[in-house]
Amino acid sequence: MRYAELQVTTHFSFLRGASSAIELFETAKSLGIDAIGVVDRNSLAGIVRALEASRATGVRLVVGCRLDLQDGMSILVYPTDRTAYSRLARLITLGKGRGGKDNCILMLDDIAQYGEGLLGILVPDLADDTCAVQLRKMAEVFGDLAYLSLCLRRRPNDQLRLHELSNMATRFKVKTVVTNDVLFHEPGRRQLQDIVTCIRNNTTIDTVGFERERHADRYLKPPEEMERLFPRYRQALRRTMEIVDRCKFSLEELTYQYPEEAIVPRKTAQESLEHYVWQCVPDRYPQGLPPKTLQIIRHELDLIHKMKYAPYFLTVFSIVRFARAKGILCQGRGSAANSAVCYILGVTSIDPETNNLLFERFVSQERDEPPDIDVDFEHERREEVIQWIYKTYGKEKAALCATVNRYRAKGAIRDVGKALGLPEDLIKALSSGMWSWSQETSDRNVRELNLNPDDRRLTLTLQLAQQLMGAPRHLGQHPGGFVLTHDRLDDLVPIEPSTMEDRQIIEWDKDDVEALKFMKVDVLALGMLTCMSKVFALIREHKGDDLDLAKIRQEDKATYEMICKADTLGTFQIESRAQMAMLPRLKPKTFYDLVVQVAIVRPGPIQGDMVHPYLRRREKKEDVDYPTPELEAVLGKTLGVPLFQESAMRVAMVCAGFTGGEADQLRKSMATFKFTGGVSRFKEKLVSGMVKNGYTPEFAEKTFSRLEGFGSYGFPESHAASFALIAYASNYVKCHFPDVFCAALLNSQPMGFYAPAQIVGDARAHGVEVRPVCVNRSRWDCTLERIGTTQQHAVRLGMRMVKGLVVADVARIVAARMNGPFDSVDDMWRRSGVPAASLVELAHADAFQPSLKLARRDVLWAIKALRDEPLPLFAAAAEREMKTIAEQNEPEVELRQMTKGHNVVEDYGHIGLTLRDHPIAFLRTDLAKRNIVTCEEAMTARDGRWVITAGLVLVRQKPGSAKGVMFITIEDETGPANIVVWPKLFEKRRRIVLGSSMMAIHGRIQREGEVVHLIAQQLFDLTSDLSGLADRDMEFKLPTGRGDEFAHGSPGGGDSRDRSPPKPRDIVVPLCRARHKGIDPEPETMPSAFPKPRDFR
């Protein structure tokens, strides 16, 4: 018997389904099920994944959706044709618009309005009066397309229930159909389904009760089993295929139409595009258009015309033109930088002719895929661009793509552990030991946490967390991928409101959009463009230079000298540990060297074994051999090594006779060969083509294996060139205007690889004076202040650095300051009108010290005398005057001042950095007694020397291409040190590596030229050494212990024999939990003030 399962829920019914579409379709194929009806709840979010699973397995997909109505009815709806699908998409959009994010509010009347062409199956519970009313309504709304589901509930009298439902359906002339209400593909997923139910209901497995499924039968069954379970309802079983035949709609029928763009009156989109291209040519080529470039432009315009992509190019041109008119810095990147048309229109900044790029990497007639132009904008002003797009195209025709937020290791551990009732501290210990979402949950990791790996609930947590990894958690918002349409967008896909105001998103992500060949425009945010925009503004204001990206001096020697020394902290793209390690070896001296530098520290070139051959050839340690002049023409710039995706494509085209489209298909097949194996069909063509053109079989095989090794991660040369432009510009500014660069970078946070503490530390190391936050001099942003009568400038930290302070209060402070500086805390409070809580935040940041010379505790004491409550009119002045007199008559209080160490802790806790001594400086005497050297001593030691050094952990990085190697950067008062932790040591000391704030490392120095690393052999967690830091001054005596007991107090307290007698007038201020209500307590343990290390995965 042929059978289709029409009620299947995938894991895109978030936290309901426990299996993916591909798992369900593969299982259906193995069981002999003809078709699957995917009916995720109130959503079509997973339907494209189901389409791809259907394509892969050959099992027919019936597009559907389960609608849960406000009156309690649940109806499975299936569009029978294309217009019915559009009505379904609009119906879901209507419900999402009413319900907001993650909710859908629909009534039966809505279905009646949009229901033409929809087939409906009522999902009943009992054959009662409610069901009778619902059946009558179903017959009225759906007519001949109305059905009633017969589904086992595995409860007492189940067969009687089915019999009554069948009779009731006959009475209302509604046909019955068998469904199985599938939630997972095989019985083993039952436990995971229970867990996601607990997560959804925010409860535990012990208390979830009847919210969980009452039976384990919610998996796919073969037709024979369904026939055995429903022996009396064979006609209802056969109707499953009847419904499949009636629902002829396929997602393949969706035809996407890009909106018409004809900016020039009375011209078509193609004519408008050509008009603007030739109009912009003199701006890019004032000396005249080179003949080769003219040929490239004509070739591109011809291909754009054939593929009907002119409206897309005009849209991107319009967006970029709007941004430039508003002074918003922007630049195109990605494969679009291969296009001469994009370059001439100002969308990208890379001349394809000069850089010998490849247009087929961007647009190919054989590939027949929509182009993809990524444009980066200043991240603080991108919203202006997004709202312009909505206003220009209309919200009914424009929306952002979704992103699928999936479970990773830590999130899976947390949610599963909570669902299974594990204690919070145990969940935290387990999740903190996870680095990435790979299978890092071995018994060894559990034992390292002193846990019992044989504990059943703990073992089950790890097993179920592994099953949950990769499952979708909810839909998020794409950073800027817009889908624009000619007609209504909700005819193609449901739209829902975003959590962000004035935004809306479709239910599909970029992969879904690409699978259906929709075109999208990527309006992305780049923090470094914000930084560079602020750099240029500060240079114009303080240096008198009118600088921009196009006017920066090219091939500046001083800039490249700085880059070669890996002095690139805070710059773009070449600031990571791996990039810094490569810079002294590659020694970039030209712009193209920088393009190579950006691209070479990537998984692709590393896995393809291309990095070391390139470096050896660059250092003249290995000869470069080109078997033919054609290969030299292709790979000459990269010394015979195909570092870029375009290089691989050119090798295929020039050496093996591939067309441009075939070469791009080769690139795509290499990118997915691990999953599809499609690369094998190109191997024979490439190898035989190269042999036919005179290459040896051995060389051809070697070439293919290299391309295969890096294809899945290869970097486009056009993309690298676009990023190299910004990388060079940021390094140029850092080299020649370090004060400006520091201020702009701080004003653009959060962004980049390093925290403000490291940015400020690096600026000071370059001779930049950095001044603290000041209530009388700081604005919201960091500013530049002239140093005396010189042309030098110091950086004044802005109030944006103060944690907990809002921009509105800062604006009031700055406005009040226009009438003169504040001379006291009370004066500032009266004139600015900011609440006392904001003054407390400024006091914690020590912002009163620079101009008013008031210490933190003195300010906090003064703030306690202020009143936020408004006083009655007329009585206000008199009452305030009396209070002031009383306060003036109050005896002066001498507060015990904070230690230097406590001030450092407070600095880190409230502004994220300190301009005082480094925290490790307070521990140096103790560390020296343990033979722990400074980071500077370690990094200047000879090669092979064994040392032990310690510092605060700044950055942890574990690149996917590094084969499990962990790179750590630590810092002490002398500077940073670079640590390499091999996989064996990482697994052995995982808790220390991932959990410590301060670490000591014993290891051996490794030098390769100017690149220095400390190869770790032993690791020690010194975080506890920081706990008493707040009690210390630079000169202090370590507490002396007496055996196993403490001397009259808490750990970390001083030796009572060294204490001086108390002064008679010392006032001890009571400790208060709420910071804004009292003075800082004397810390017995250090608060978690230091910024957490930045982890890069």
Curated annotation (Swiss-Prot):
Residues 1055-1066 have a biased composition (Basic and acidic residues). GO terms for biological process: DNA repair; DNA replication. GO terms for cellular component: cytoplasm. It is found in: Cytoplasm. One of its GO terms (molecular function) is nucleic acid binding. Its EC number is 2.7.7.7. InterPro entries: DNA_pol3_alpha_NTPase_dom, DNA_pol3_finger, DnaE2, DnaE2/DnaE/PolC, DNAPol_HHH, NA-bd_OB_tRNA, PHP_dom, Pol/His_phosphatase_N. SUPFAM superfamilies: PHP domain-like. Residues 1039-1097 are annotated as: Disordered. It catalyses: DNA(n) + a 2'-deoxyribonucleoside 5'-triphosphate = DNA(n+1) + diphosphate. Its main location: cytoplasm. Pfam families: DNA_pol3_alpha, DNA_pol3_finger, HHH_6, PHP, tRNA_anti-codon. The keyword DNA damage applies. Keywords: Cytoplasm, DNA damage, DNA repair, DNA replication, DNA-directed DNA polymerase, Nucleotidyltransferase, Transferase. DNA polymerase involved in damage-induced mutagenesis and translesion synthesis (TLS). It is not the major replicative DNA polymerase. Belongs to the DNA polymerase type-C family. DnaE2 subfamily. This is Error-prone DNA polymerase. It comes from Allorhizobium ampelinum (strain ATCC BAA-846 / DSM 112012 / S4).
